[in-house]
Amino acid sequence: MDVISHFAARYERTREEEMSLEDYLAECKRNPLAYATAAERMLKAIGEPTTIDTRNDPRLSRIFANKVIKVYPAFAEFYGMEDSIEQVVSYFRHAAQGLEEKKQVLYLLGPVGGGKSSIAERLKQLMQEVPFYAIKGSPVNESPLGLFDIAEDGAILEKEYGIPRRYLTRILSPWAVKRLEEYGGDVRRFRVVKRYPSILKQIAVCKTEPGDENNQDISSLVGKVDIRKLETFAQDDPDAYSYAGGLCLANQGLLEFVEMFKAPIKVLHPLLTATQEGNFKGTEGFGAIPFDGIILAHSNESEWKSFRNNKNNEAFLDRVYIVKVPYCLRVTEEIKIYEKLIRNSSLGAATCAPGTLKMMSQFAILTRLKEPENSSLFSKMLVYDGENLKDTDPRAKSIQEYRDYAGVDEGMSGISTRFAYKILSKVFNFDSTEVAANPVHLMYVLEQQIEREQFAKEVEQKYVGFVKELLAPRYAEFIGKEIQTAYLESYSEYGQNIFDRYVTYADYWIQDHEYRDTDTGEVFDRQALNAELEKIEKPAGIANPKDFRNEIVNFVLRARASNQGKNPVWTSYEKLRTVIEKKMFSNTEELLPVISFNAKASADEAKKHEDFVTRMVAKGYTQKQVRLLCEWYLRVRKSS
């Protein structure tokens, strides 16, 4: 299907369908969604979650304590926000059941750039997916069920059409009351339309923002009289009223109130009755206007605190369902957020050197975590990401211990994902000759930006400390391994020679025999053999050489039996491979000709250098980055 046909089909699918009141009631009998509340339709749009048994994944089992967690496909790209999303869904679930949440404002509370607006936007998109039914021509999208009285008609509607009585508490709008009078009480003259909520047309989805303290009034929520119509209608006539307020437009849908607590308190008053009683008063002297929708608000913590501390606002506080939306605290998930942002920009095709996003993520999360007791902050970050530190940091605690000590406000401060993304944008564009990112430029840009942001002195020192004391040394170790593996592949023959020599020396040393080198005629006694073996073992810090040598010789003897009497390849035994790699990599003089970008002394060296660069490029670096990172690594190594 081409794009034009696809658009036409979508437009046709969401067109209004008109029907009689009798047909609508028959539809109610067939399909409970015909009379569903906004919360029920939202649940339908969100859909069923997929469950993940975290016992089957070592990393997730540590993070979620072996629990079965729910993941909602509708929020698949909201990484690291499982708790917040589950609370939002719980709100809709309880509201759909007709519980107290139905009468409350869903309030997303969190730091700047933490994802509140993204959740709100996603909920508005989901609201558009399931249609609702309204009286045709109603300026407030009111439900046809408002025409019926629960006391008089409830039993009949429940028996004949299966409509539970709790759906019959809606009232008629003043506009519908006037039409009913005009029709002489004949409800059959009302027509019903099936409509899809629409953000663009402001049908059952609306956004309200705080205005100026002096000129914003309740009309932004409840509407006001239309002066142009006063020539035809009296001021208190429902037809002279402009139902353009947020509560009017969002009936049977969702009203988003951005930065709600920045609005003057007088503006918020209609929300009290709209949520609790399902209706609100307009600015003119006619009856109440129905409201059966969801009010979604969000703001930063500072506004919430000042609002909460004002005793005059107690009536509101009891009508708010708070969902905290903290920053992501898991490195792996934070990386996914950056990848998503980069993917949706022109940087998606640019080279991002391995370790860049991880370093940015680690820095961001270090700023968000609360300092633990008797443990390092870096270890806490690794534990939060599901790593097992049992063997590497005996002082590391369990994830629950860290959380208990940190309290409920962890993740509500630190640098935002928005800040991190701006840093990454600068890093990608740091080099004027190529659009690419690498960790060395990232560290430089981070330090510059920390100074420019004018944080408090102690915060600035702490953040710079994260870069210099935690991230830089670990990156030096990481890039060292990257260079090492690319370098060693140029020396597979050299590695095999060391392996064969080590095995021979160890075998003679164990048997306490002298060894004569067949090429040079040199003789090694047990002491000389030990000295040669230690040259290989010492860079790797082998604690018990005797056991290690026995272990290696036994392995090689077994391997020879199935390899026609030949030694296995030097990379086949992980323990000895590591020892040989460290031995080969311990001598910078041997390393320099291959990884440095100076003029080469021989064609052989030049070939090895080219092979090294090619392998680094295959790992995900540009040629320019290979040079920069190698030079940075050699400088760091020299200074240490």
Predicted region positions:
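Long, basic/Gly/Ser/Thr-rich N-terminal segments
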Residues: M1-E40
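Conserved ASCE/P-loop NTPase catalytic core
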Residues: P32-S640
